[in-house]
Curated annotation (Swiss-Prot):
Signal peptide residues on this chain, from the entry's feature table: 1-30
Membrane topology: Single-pass type I membrane protein
Protein name: Sodium channel regulatory subunit beta-4
Disulfide bonds: 53-131
Protein source organism: Homo sapiens (Human)
Alphabetical UniProt keywords: Atrial fibrillation, Cell membrane, Disease variant, Disulfide bond, Glycoprotein, Immunoglobulin domain, Ion transport, Long QT syndrome, Membrane, Signal, Sodium, Sodium transport, Transmembrane, Transmembrane helix, Transport
SMART domains tied to this protein: IG
Pfam families: V-set
Transmembrane segments: 163-183
Membrane-side (Cytoplasmic) residue stretches: 184-228
Length: 228
């Protein structure tokens, strides 16, 4: 029967899917390399710039290998290479192509930092800088991240005029609304007090009228006792 055959294949299919998921899980949760949120950075000619790079691994690392490479439209070169023995060791440089480069990272205290500083920038330093990491503990799994550096004459100042105008307008509107609410509350308070005073005056005036007209309950109703 077709139904019986399908019933026998279903468990095998689910088992195969589960095994595939277990096989792919270490890949998705393993080695990661990051250069931060800003992948495009600018620096002034003649200054220095920090090129950040950190890595992480859920399975730890041993004899980890890293390198920084430079790539532009007409050049490619390895800037610096090194290794990290384990989590308790600092990075060790094995190759450096440019004396202007300094490794400033540390892997102690789980920082896993292999950032570099590039000094005395030149316009020719403009290009892509890629941080590569290979972890032998994860079957030589590799990962990388790239920063684009643009060397300029000077950094352009950001014009915040529009932002300041918007903030001023918004602040003015909020202040006006608060002022209107305060005035409204003040008017309501004054009207309430005025009504209370009018009510007191009416009650007092009514009492005086009763007294003058000799109505029951007034002093005019009282008579002196008659003499026998």
């Amino acid at each position: 029967m077709p139904g019986a055959g399908d019933g026998g294949k279903a468990p095998a299919r689910w088992l195969g899917t589960g095994l595939l998921g277990l096989f792919l899980l270490p890949v998705t949760l393993s080695l990661e390399v990051s250069v931060g949120k800003a992948t495009d950075i600018y620096a002034v000619n003649g200054t220095e710039i920090l090129l950040p790079c950190t890595f992480s691994s859920c399975f730890g690392f041993e004899d980890l290998h890293f390198r920084w490479t430079y790539n532009s439209s007409d050049a490619f070169k390895i800037l610096i290479e090194g290794t990290v023995k384990n989590e308790k060791s600092d990075p060790k440089v094995t190759l450096k192509d440019d004396d202007r480069i300094t490794l400033v990272g540390s892997t102690k205290e789980k920082m896993n930092n292999i950032s570099i500083v590039l000094r005395d920038l030149e316009f020719s330093d403009t290009g892509k800088y890629t941080c590569h990491v290979k972890n032998p503990k994860e079957n030589n799994l590799q990962h990388h991240a790239t920063i684009f550096l643009q060397v300029v004459d000077r950094l352009e100042e950001v014009d915040n005029t529009v932002t300041l105008i918007i903030l001023a307008v918004v602040g003015g509107v909020i202040g006006l609304l608060i002022l209107i609410l305060l005035i409204k509350k003040l008017i309501i308070f004054i009207l309430k007090k005025t009504r209370e005073k009018k009510k007191e005056c009416l009650v007092s005036s009514s009492g005086n009228d009763n007294t003058e007209n000799g109505l029951p309950g007034s002093k005019a109703e009282e008579k002196p006792p008659s003499k026998v």
